[in-house]
UniProtKB/Swiss-Prot annotation:
It comes from Mycobacterium tuberculosis (strain CDC 1551 / Oshkosh). Belongs to the amino acid-polyamine-organocation (APC) superfamily. Probable amino-acid or metabolite transport protein. This is Uncharacterized transporter MT2031. InterPro entries: AA/rel_permease1 (IPR002293), APC_superfamily (IPR050367). It holds the Pfam family AA_permease_2. GO terms for molecular function: transmembrane transporter activity. Keywords: Cell membrane, Membrane, Transmembrane, Transmembrane helix, Transport. The keyword Transmembrane helix applies. The lineage of its organism: Bacteria, Bacillati, Actinomycetota, Actinomycetes, Mycobacteriales. Its main location: membrane. It is found in: Cell membrane. It comes from the Bacteria. GO terms for cellular component: plasma membrane. It is a multi-pass membrane protein.
């Protein structure tokens, strides 16, 4: 679609089909390669249902984010939504925790990449399973951060290359797995789906991991859905480019369900093929790329792992570029010190990059590089946004402010879906076993506890102090709206 003209040139905005493709590419990442083993172990033969539930929830929250973008035109960030609805007091916390969450997400991705790389490059060594602070795995992690910094020095061109590389890698790996897997299933009449029962064990349901209520399929499905949701992360960013889209009010609410449905269909096909090839092998595998464990042919298995590795590398490059910019955006708006936004001669915000990289390394170290716990943390950390943004949308829909007067209200997307998102988000959040974050081998994990307190309490508190100190210095009063 051609938009308005600027200096004689037509501005081409993203049409409906482009928005759908953007959504699909934003969601499909490393998650589908990494999560099947844990999901099968938690849900057994009901593992596909966990991905269906995760997809439905992702679709609901994505539509909530897209609807909020109708009221806030500046950008699609959760920081902007909550600031517009509740003022800086709430917006600052959401903005800071969003930056922290992005840093954690990058750390999880980097941990997965390093583990996979060590397994592929050194299959005879146990380096990929190391839990110690000082290990080959930690050194490789630091080296990988250095490589990502070097790539960042090349600027946007390198990021475009990384996105293209990631897309090619994941498309090739998934296509090869599905086509090759179906060929094996049909020609050799393979059906190992029922072996999922041997991998399944009912998980106790406990509120916050403390008060145990019962043990059964429901509790297992709740935890499996949280893990499966990691494969859908990225859906919350679909609406970020709303200003670049043609008629986002009309196209986003239609495009997002199609994108989620398409991704869900791909995931279900991939998971079904994997479970038919060998559910028990996937669940029992110690490899990072769980899907490959179902394949008996070594060459075919290597192709899938390398494709996933290429995909993870590209995603890490993009994360290393985007996550530090969240800190610089907060610094530019006065929430954080301006030195966080200072860039070197290569246009890299070194202070923000250092903060992001430190958090990216700290959390995997605190959780001993445990893939299941890292996946859960990456999802749970996002629930701050998943709960507050729907509340912000309800407030924006009720607002009588002039800037929101022209927005056409819709009771279903403005009230019903946000309420559903809030209820489900709270339900999943309280279902998570937080002991895996705060405890290690039965005792307190002081490293992890200190990190959580510093990142989610101390850092936001410092941001508030800095912001209000700046306000007092200029002699203005902060908005409480």
């Amino acid at each position: 679609m051609v938009g308005p003209r600027t200096r004689g040139y037509a501005i081409h905005k993203l049409g409906f089909c482009s928005v759908v493709m953007l959504g699909i590419n934003s969601i499909i990442g490393a998650g589908i390669f990494l999560t099947p083993g844990e999901v099968i172990g938690l849900a057994g033969p009901f593992a596909p249902m966990a991905y269906v539930l995760a997809g439905i929830f992702a679709g609901v929250v994505a539509i909530v984010f897209a609807t909020a973008a109708r009221y806030v035109r500046t950008n699609g960030a959760s920081y902007a939504y909550t600031t517009a609805a509740f003022g800086r007091r709430i917006g600052i916390y959401v903005g800071v925790t969003h930056a922290i969450t992005a840093s954690i997400a990058w750390g999880v991705l980097a941990s997965f990449f390093v583990s996979t790389l060590l397994r592929v490059a050194f299959p005879d060594k146990a380096w990929a399973d190391a839990e110690q602070l000082f290990s080959v795995k930690t050194l490789t992690f630091l080296g990988f951060i250095g490589v990502l910094l070097a790539i960042n020095l090349f600027g946007n061109r390198a990021i475009k290359w990384a996105n293209g590389t990631s897309t090619v890698g994941k498309a090739f790996a998934l296509s090869a797995f599905i086509v090759g897997g179906l060929w094996i299933i049909t020609t050799q009449h393979v059906n190992n789906y029922a072996t999922a029962w041997s991998a399944y064990s009912a998980t106790p349901y406990s509120l916050l991991g403390v008060a145990e209520i019962g043990k059964g399929t429901f509790s297992s499905m709740a935890l499996a859905t949280i893990v499966a949701l990691y494969a859908f992360t990225g859906f919350e960013s679909i609406a970020n480019a709303a200003e670049e889209m043609d008629a986002p009010d009309r196209n986003l609410p239609r495009a997002i369900p199609i994108a989620i449905f398409s991704v869900g269909a791909i995931y279900l096909l991939t998971l079904t093929v994997a479970m038919l090839l060998g559910s028990n092998k996937i669940a029992a595998s110690d490899d990072t790329v769980k899907l490959a464990a179902a394949i008996g042919n070594a060459t075919f298995r290597t192709i899938i792992v390398v494709g996933a590795l290429i995909s993870m590398f590209g995603i890490n490059v993009a994360a290393s570029f985007g996550a530090p910019r969240l800190w610089t955006a907060l610094a530019d708006s006065g929430v954080l010190p301006t030195r966080l936004s200072r860039k070197n001669q290569y246009d890299v915000p070194m202070v923000s990059f250092a903060i992001t990289a430190s958090l990216a390394l700290a959390f995997p170290l605190a959780l001993r590089f445990d893939n299941l716990h890292l996946t859960g943390l990456a999802v749970i950390a996002r629930f701050v946004q998943f709960i507050i943004v729907p509340i912000a949308l309800i407030a924006l829909a009720r607002s009588q402010a002039v800037e929101h007067a022209a927005v056409r209200r819709n009771a279903f997307t403005d009230k019903v879906l946000p309420l559903v998102a809030i209820v489900v988000s709270v339900g999943l959040a309280v279902s998570y076993d937080y002991r895996c974050i705060f405890l290690v081998r039965g005792g307190p994990n002081y490293f992890s506890i200190a990190l959580i307190v510093i990142t989610f309490i101390v850092v936001p508190a410092m941001a508030y102090l800095h912001y209000y100190r700046i306000i007092r210095r200029v002699g203005d009063r902060p908005s409480t709206r």
